Each structure stands twice: as C-alpha cells, then as structure tokens.
UniProtKB/Swiss-Prot annotation:
Enzyme Commission code(s) on record: 3.6.5.-
Species assigned in the record: Bos taurus (Bovine)
Regulation: The GTPase activity is promoted by GTPAse activators, such as RGS14, RGS16 and RGS19.
Gene Ontology cellular-component terms listed: cytoplasm; heterotrimeric G-protein complex
Record keywords, A-Z: Cell membrane, GTP-binding, Hydrolase, Lipoprotein, Magnesium, Membrane, Metal-binding, Myristate, Nucleotide-binding, Palmitate, Transducer
Binding site for Mg(2+): 47, 182
Gene this chain is encoded by: GNAO1
GO biological process, one term: adenylate cyclase-modulating G protein-coupled receptor signaling pathway
Keyword Transit peptide: no
Residues found modified as 5-glutamyl histamine: 205
Protein topology in the membrane: Lipid-anchor
Protein name per the record: Guanine nucleotide-binding protein G(o) subunit alpha
Binding locations of GTP: 43, 46-48, 152, 176-179, 270, 273, 325
UniProt-recorded Gene Ontology molecular function terms: corticotropin-releasing hormone receptor 1 binding; G protein-coupled serotonin receptor binding; G-protein beta/gamma-subunit complex binding; GTP binding; GTPase activity; metal ion binding; mu-type opioid receptor binding
Length: 354
C-alpha cells in the first residue's frame, strides 16, 4: 500500500503553518520540554517509531549503529526461517521436496548452537535459499497466524542473496525492520519545532508493563501503538489471548487511568501495510465475531478505530487517531508533524492563547 499524502495529512500541514505563524506572532519562543510516552502491547511497532525519530530528527544511523545491527539482521533472518521449519512439524505440512529436510536440520543446528548472529556460510546460505523456495515452506509461511513469526520474515528471506553477500551492510530499511524485544525503558531526546522532546519507549510484553509506572508523572502526551495486523494473532506470552483484544484492554486501562486525566492520547493504528494485505485473506470476524461490514481495508480499519475510541469514558478527552506504517519514514514524518501540532495547540490552550 502506498503511503501518499491524504487530505487529512495535507490539512495537517496547513494547520502546522498556521500554528507556527501564531507562535511567532505571540513571541512564544522559549523552548518547552515535552514528555512523550510510547505505550502499546508487544510488537506493536513502538521501537520502530523510536528508530524513525533517530532518522528524522537526529542524524540517522552511524557506522557504529550499522555494525551493531548487522548480527541482529542475521539472527532475525535465520530465526524466522527456523520458526517456519518448526511449524512445518506442528502443522503437519510436508516439504515440496523431501531433500529439504537436510537443509532444515542445518538451519536448526545453527540456531541451537547459538550461531544465529554470525554471517551465513555459503553452504548455509544455499540451504536457506532452497528452503525459502520450497512449496511446503511457502504454504507454512502463509499460515503464520497459527504460530509466532516475526513480521519482517518475508522482507528478510526475500533478500537472502543480498543479506548473505560477503560485503553485506544493513540498509536503513533493514535496520528499521529489525526486531529486538524491548526490556525496561529506552529514552530518546530530540528537538523539533522549538520543543525539547523526551520520548520514552516502554517494553510492551506483560512482564515489562510494571516498569511503566515510573514514567507517569507530568507526561505531555501518550502515543499508543496498536498493530492493526494483530487481529488474527495471539500473544507471544499467552497463546490464548488475541493480540487485538489485549491491545483494547490495555488501551482502556491507559485511556481511563486517573494519572492521565489531562494527558493527550494519540492512537497510532500501525502496520497498515500488513493489515491491507491480510484483510484480503483473513476476515475481521476472527477477532470481532459481531462485525458485519466488508473485509476491505477502509471498512475494517474504521471498525477497529471505532472499537478503540469507544473505550474512552471521558466526555472531554479527545483521542487523536492516525493510521501508520512505522517502517515508512515519509508517513511517520507527516504523522509526527501533525502530532507535534496537537501538542503545541494543547499547550497554547493551556495558557489561554489558542
């Protein structure tokens, strides 16, 4: 799905210009501290948003960053393939060519020896490419909602020849798509539109959530991330709970929390690209049995948005919602620009100036 400028985004740019003009006229030039909390269930795209801030508002990834992400790309790639191989057994799927079993064993052996962060040997690379090309593996990949698989599996496995090259260096997109579970709290600082941002990315898995409480004081706004594509998947940490239901429950508790009575809440309905692909094959009724609309991107996404908005029990609290694709830098740049304008407008309203 392309991420071109929508009417809503063009309006946001116009609003942005107007607010900047107001600020200049009012002579409010003292830089203000903004504390942003990134919340959401595990694997909703929070850390990818942080990486985008590094690209958009800092200097992107340094040579040192690229070096550090290289083993992560190797690991994400081979671990994804190993997860598909393991699911072949669980789901009882046969390989298109039974000789692939030897290739599968080689992949699983590398993972069990914990050599997954190392460059692929020529033999291993050939085995991985043969496996990814196998019809049984592809059938198993198409059923990935039935087991746990990294969202970037296809992206990396489609690029095996490039990632397996001797002179491989991760690209910006490779780095954006890496998946490392966030433990604890990661703080990022940057300045934009005369505001000093302190952005806190908090681990989304259930075990990490108790660490959020320290961040609750004087938060300017919360960005709550939801993986739209999680509607037909279960949690890593609890395979009986649907990911979208978990997100809704968590959003309810954040949105109506006494700590956040006066905090702006910005909802990022993320992974809209994956959702757009998935909704063609996997009906929304998997998650919402009462849904009677069509399985088009527009209708299904609007229904999910309404489910989240209905959790807000405060009549004077507004939820600002954006459909996002966290791996698309242009999309996040436009959306974050609009988010900043909301923060500025709310700040001015607080001072009676807007």
């Amino acid at each position: 799905m392309g991420c071109t400028l929508s009417a809503e985004e063009r309006a946001a740019l116009e609003r942005s210009k107007a607010i900047e003009k107001n600020l200049k006229e009012d002579g409010i030039s003292a830089a203000k501290d903004v504390k942003l909390l990134l919340l959401g269930a595990g694997e909703s795209g929070k850390s990818t948003i942080v990486k985008q801030m590094k690209i958009i508002h800092e200097d992107g990834f340094s040579g040192e960053d690229v070096k550090q992400y290289k083993p992560v790309v190797y690991s994400n790639t081979i671990q994804s393939l190993a997860a598909i191989v393991r699911a072949m057994d669980t789901l009882g799927i046969e390989y298109g060519d039974k000789e692939r079993k030897a290739d599968a064993k080689m992949v699983c052996d590398v993972v069990s020896r914990m050599e997954d962060t190392e460059p692929f040997s020529p033999e291993l690379l050939s085995a991985m490419m043969r496996l990814w090309g196998d019809s049984g593996i592809q059938e198993c990949f198409n059923r990935s909602r039935e087991y746990q698989l990294n969202d970037s599996a296809k992206y990396y496995l489609d690029s095996l020849d490039r990632i397996g090259a001797a002179d491989y260096q991760p690209t910006e997109q490779d780095i954006l798509r890496t998946r490392v579970k966030t433990t604890g709290i990661v703080e990022t600082h940057f300045t934009f539109k005369n505001l000093h941002f302190r952005l806190f990315d908090v681990g989304g898995q259930r075990s990490e959530r108790k660490k959020w409480i320290h961040c609750f004081e004087d938060v300017t706004a919360i960005i709550f991330c939801v993986a739209l594509s999680g509607y037909d998947q279960v949690l890593h940490e609890d395979e009986t709970t649907n990911r979208m239901h978990e997100s809704l429950m968590l959003f309810d508790s954040i949105c109506n929390n006494k700590f956040f009575i006066d905090t702006s809440i910005i909802l990022f309905l993320n992974k809209k690209d994956l959702f757009g692909e998935k909704i063609k094959k996997s009906p929304l009724t998997i998650c919402f049995p009462e849904y009677t609309g069509s399985n088009t991107y527009e209708d299904a996404a609007a229904y999910i948005q309404a489910q989240f908005e209905s959790k807000n029990r405060s009549p004077n609290k507004e939820i600002y919602c954006h459909m996002t694709c966290a791996t698309d830098t242009n999309n996040i740049q436009v959306v974050f620009d609009a988010v900043t304008d909301i923060i500025i407008a709310n700040n001015l309203r607080g001072c009676g100036l807007y």
